[in-house]
């Protein structure tokens, strides 16, 4: 309940701030709100704004969502090994030492997030630490560190911002045309009817275009996973990376809770593969073997 309340409060605050900023931009530039240029300004502001704010808050939101505990001082040999391994890999790829956290989950999962290469987070589940060998866990960590080194979080945010901008702009532009056409053809409807037409059409189009755009963003996400696997193979050797993926394939299939779960994926092929953020495990293993 607290997490939902925090999410709603954050979104409300973002919407209020965006509205204020948008009105200031219109006032300073003299752009008319109903014009195409005004619509484009609004689409860019809202399209990129949400993505950038989510990126800036990603570390704290990720830790809160999984109940992760940051390792400040290692309390046991496993935590000491975890910090030492991440530190060594970070030095190898030339990034700052990420914050390292552990969260309680029986699934073999890990994820990386953060707005900067030198201010990032790597979190691993207790299930991964208990179920994988050190070599396999090392490969998983290398995969996450490679995501950070490649700037995947920032790249995905920028891509999502561009996609959001096009979805908002096209939806509102078409809705403007439709509402203008219907209001001129239908007598007695007035401004209220025109607004309702605009609202309904723009909402439906944003949902439809957003769904279609998700195929593109998920394709890009799968593409970056192959790069992270290759980066991990360079850090620790491809046999360790293959062994980690084989362990995941043999393990219990995990159900993801959002795009931040960067390593736990379902290896089963299905018709929904185009909407998966990760390639099937078999394809990732084959790609590594062909390196």
Swiss-Prot record:
GO terms for molecular function: metalloendopeptidase activity; zinc ion binding. InterPro entries: HtpX_protease, Pept_M48_protease_HtpX, Peptidase_M48. Its EC number is 3.4.24.-. Keywords: Cell inner membrane, Cell membrane, Hydrolase, Membrane, Metal-binding, Metalloprotease, Protease, Stress response, Transmembrane, Transmembrane helix, Zinc. It is a multi-pass membrane protein. The chain crosses the membrane at residues 4-24, 36-56, 151-171, 199-219. It comes from the Bacteria. GO terms for biological process: proteolysis. The keyword Cell membrane applies. Its cofactor is Zn(2+). GO terms for cellular component: plasma membrane. The active site is at residue 144. Binds 1 zinc ion per subunit. It is found in: Cell inner membrane. Zn(2+) binds at residues 143, 147, 225. Belongs to the peptidase M48B family. HAMAP family: Pept_M48_protease_HtpX. This is Protease HtpX. It comes from Aliivibrio fischeri (strain MJ11).
């Amino acid at each position: 309940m607290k997490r939902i309340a925090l999410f709603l409060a954050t979104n409300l605050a973002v919407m209020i701030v965006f509205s204020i900023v948008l009105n200031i931009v219109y006032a300073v530039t003299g752009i008319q709100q109903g014009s195409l240029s005004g619509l484009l300004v609004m689409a860019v502001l809202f399209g990129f704004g949400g993505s950038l704010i989510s990126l800036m808050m990603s570390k704290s939101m990720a830790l809160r969502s999984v109940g992760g505990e940051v390792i400040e001082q290692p309390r046991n040999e496993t935590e000491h090994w975890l910090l030492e391994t991440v530190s060594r890999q970070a030095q190898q790829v030339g990034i700052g030492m990420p914050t390292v956290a552990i969260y309680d989950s029986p699934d073999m999962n890990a994820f990386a997030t953060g707005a900067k290469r030198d201010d990032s987070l790597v979190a691993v589940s207790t299930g991964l630490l208990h179920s994988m060998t050190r070599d396999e866990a090392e490969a998983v960590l290398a995969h996450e560190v490679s995501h950070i080194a490649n700037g995947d979080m920032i790249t995905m945010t920028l891509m999502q911002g561009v996609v959001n901008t096009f979805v908002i702009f096209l939806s509102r532009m078409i809705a403007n045309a439709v509402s203008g056409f219907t209001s001129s053809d239908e007598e007695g409807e007035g401004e209220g009817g025109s607004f309702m037409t605009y609202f309904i059409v723009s909402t439906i189009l944003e949902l439809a275009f957003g769904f279609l755009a998700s195929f593109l963003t998920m394709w890009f996400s799968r593409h970056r996973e192959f790069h992270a696997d290759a980066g991990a193979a360079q850090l620790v050797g491809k046999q360790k990376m293959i062994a980690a993926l084989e362990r995941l394939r043999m393990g219990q299939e995990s159900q993801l809770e959002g795009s931040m779960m960067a390593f736990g994926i379902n290896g089963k092929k299905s018709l929904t593969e185009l909407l998966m953020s990760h390639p099937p495990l078999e394809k990732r293993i084959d790609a590594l073997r062909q390196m």
